[in-house]
Amino acid sequence: MAKKDTTPMMKQYYEIKEQYPDAFLFYRVGDFYELFEDDAIKGAQILELTLTHRSNKTKNPIPMAGVPHLAVDTYVNTLVEKGYKVALCEQLEDPKKAKGMVKRGIIQLITPGTMMQERPDQAKDSNYLTSVISTNSGFGLAYSDLSTGETFSTHLADFEAVANELLSLQTREVVYNGHLTDLNKDFLKKANITVSEPVEVEGEHAEISYVAQNLTDDAEIKATKQLVAYLLSTQKRSLAHLQVAQSYEPTQYLQMSHTVQTNLELIKSAKTSKKMGSLFWLLDKTSTAMGGRLLKSWIERPLLSVTEITRRQEMVQALLDDYFTREKVIDSLKGVYDLERLTGRIAFGSVNAREMLQLAHSLGAIPEILNALLETNNPHLQNFAKQIDPLKGIHDLIVNTIVDNPPLPTTEGGLIREGVSEQLDRYRDAMNNGKKWLSEMESHEREVTGINNLKVGYNKVFGYYIEVTNSNKSKVPTDRYTRKQTLTNAERYITPDLKEHEALILEAEAKSTGLEYDLFVKLREDVKKYIPALQKLAKQIASLDVLTNFATVSEQNNYVRPNFVTDKQEINVVNGRHPVVEQVMTAGSYIPNDVKMDQDTNIFLITGPNMSGKSTYMRQMALIAIMAQIGSFVPADSATLPIFDQIFTRIGAADDLISGQSTFMVEMSEANDALQHATKRSLVLFDEIGRGTATYDGMALAGAIVKYLHDKVGAKALFATHYHELTDLDQTLKHLKNIHVGATEENGKLIFLHKILPGPADQSYGIHVAQLAGLPHKVLREATTMLKRLEKQGASELQPASEQLDLFVPEEASAPAISDDEKDVLDEIQNVYLADKTPLQVMELVAQWQQELKDKD
């Protein structure tokens, strides 16, 4: 960086900037944070700031832009959300007391993975910083949400597994110690993940050993220590709220790749990337932010343990059966703030008095929740309540210390209740007496001078003063008043008495404000001792929130409690419904369908027209399984399910983010993933496998995949296809059954029944679907002609191998010569649906056709 200004302040700036070249340096100057040089130019553009210059009189003025210190969080968040890092450089001493240049230093490096200030619409989102260690045995991965302190670790075999985990976590930043290939770099760039280098921290830090204390895997230990070291380095403070890392194996949960989660729209709509339209959107009626985050994590990691699932189900059933208790709990939960993140801010030292009261109010709601649960006769609700410590002592400590409506700043006084500190009360008495004296002085001076609008005021530059308008200057007693400031319409004066009392008042105010801040810090440190207890309470309340939410959603949507079979792989879902689709349809219009697969049936081969509901039926099965394994009730009349260990999907056409593969290559890769890793306890959904290549290649591949699933894998599979030739496989594959989505034709129009029926579909209705999509009549007519020719010529095995199936031969010579325009009119006549037309409308149509034929002559 070219150093254009070597004044002491800018010299200090350059020295600090050299330490953080990849970050925006927010440099505190008075009430502003300033950006200089390239930071100012780029920052002004991104943040829409006015770009000015320092040292304008020199040949090379320095670009400069600033933001008020009270609004800095907004600007920092904007930069960090765009993937940048921000170094906050603060004044480390009172400028009034500084000898020479004010000491400054970085108090925090804010990065995409360490941002704690979320927007209101992000309250139910986690922000994970992830650490990855490359070892000879694979990769150690650890991640933490700094705002809550929760920390997890695992060991993964290869970078593809790491990439999948990063995408599933929606991590914003990864600390990585290894070499990145160009392919890996490309993936991280496409995924908008910031890559940061590991750092080493000097000295011993209790947090590092504390967080990793329960880990046994060497790669996980290294990844976790690397994670905590990076957090300590960037945050530059104690991080007492970081929780002991929980080690997990992906195989502990129902495994679903990021692609599967995307295809099934678990967290976001695949079309809009928004919450609306996803399973999370449907199920999320939680009352607290921490409940919403927990629900999301449950959806992403369904359980495998029937015991754990049943424990959740029992709570949901109890809350579903007891409406009044449930409503009491919900009402009380609405008064609970984000305990997890409040606890994090307390540990972080950034909590203010209002947030401290939010913690107290949240704790105040806990006894109401416990009473509601304990007053029931249900042992599950009672036992849950008995495990909760309401932490009444913390609640009482806060409400007895902080005033009811404290100001936002913690350094300007007005925080602490009267009676908390005798010394503080004495300072306040002195302040009050001084202000009383000022009021009396103002009245006295008005009386003795005859200036009725004389007033006593205060500002930070001159202190207390007496202000007199210009029209009354002649009445000023010059022997006692000393002029201090001239304004446009008034003069300001001081007197010896005023300055004497000013010193007393300001001294009392300064001491009072300082003592209040000290008392607030003491309160914060006292509460900090209870961080583990607060974190445990937060998890319990979040869990109750999710389970109560399940009961509410189940009641609203008429869900049923699923049963599980563990000794055999059987599915028996009666009148199952797609939970999201039914919500966006008119009430009662959704057509439910059964899924019944006994021990002798592993594969459903599904045929039927496009748009008829094959994909919906398949997704419906997967979502019901996921809902069941997170402890939710499910959309069906009844449901008996096995415990699935993995779900694989090949649904939709999208290129691959991780490797940049084409759609067909992605299709084959995902099919291979299922064929290689699925077990008899897995659920496989394949939709239109083989459509990305030539017809016979695709048909051959699809048939071979079905056979491999049947003979080698043995998983429960729903296989939708447009290759009707595959329906003959039920003759040789005894565990395969044909089903189809019903459709019928009425007056030349295709009617979807959306009902699953036994056996294969008799035709595909592809041209009818194209008609529904609005394709031109000429295209539809040409397609119909080709279809008839194909049906007449038959399949390829009836022709010599060297002969191409000629679709584009001319019409038979005997066909009457009809122009294309005339054919268009004939098509309109053939396709018009007369049943919904009045006689007058029919007459108008006939007249229109007659005119069209005349115009074409």
Swiss-Prot record:
Q: Which Pfam families match?
A: MutS_I (PF01624), MutS_II (PF05188), MutS_III (PF05192), MutS_IV (PF05190), MutS_V (PF00488)
> Keywords, A to Z?
ATP-binding, DNA damage, DNA repair, DNA-binding, Nucleotide-binding
Please indicate if the UniProt record lists DNA repair as a keyword. yes
Database matches in PROSITE patterns: DNA_MISMATCH_REPAIR_2 (PS00486)
For this protein, the record's InterPro entries field holds: DNA_mismatch_repair_MutS, DNA_mismatch_repair_MutS-lik_N, DNA_mismatch_repair_MutS/MSH, DNA_mismatch_repair_MutS_C, DNA_mismatch_repair_MutS_clamp, DNA_mismatch_repair_MutS_core, DNA_mismatch_repair_MutS_N, DNA_mismatch_repair_MutS_sf
For this entry, the protein name equals: DNA mismatch repair protein MutS
Molecular functions per Gene Ontology: ATP binding; ATP-dependent DNA damage sensor activity; damaged DNA binding; mismatched DNA binding
Q: Which family does it belong to?
A: Belongs to the DNA mismatch repair MutS family.
Q: Which GO terms describe its cellular component?
A: cytosol
Q: Write out the function statement from the record.
A: This protein is involved in the repair of mismatches in DNA. It is possible that it carries out the mismatch recognition step. This protein has a weak ATPase activity.
Q: Which HAMAP family match?
A: MutS
- Which CDD domains does the protein's record reference? ABC_MutS1
Q: Which gene encodes it?
A: mutS
**Gene3D superfamilies reported for this sequence:** 1.10.1420.10, DNA repair protein MutS, domain I, MutS, connector domain, P-loop containing nucleotide triphosphate hydrolases
Residues where ATP binds:
608-615
SMART domains reported for this sequence: MUTSac, MUTSd
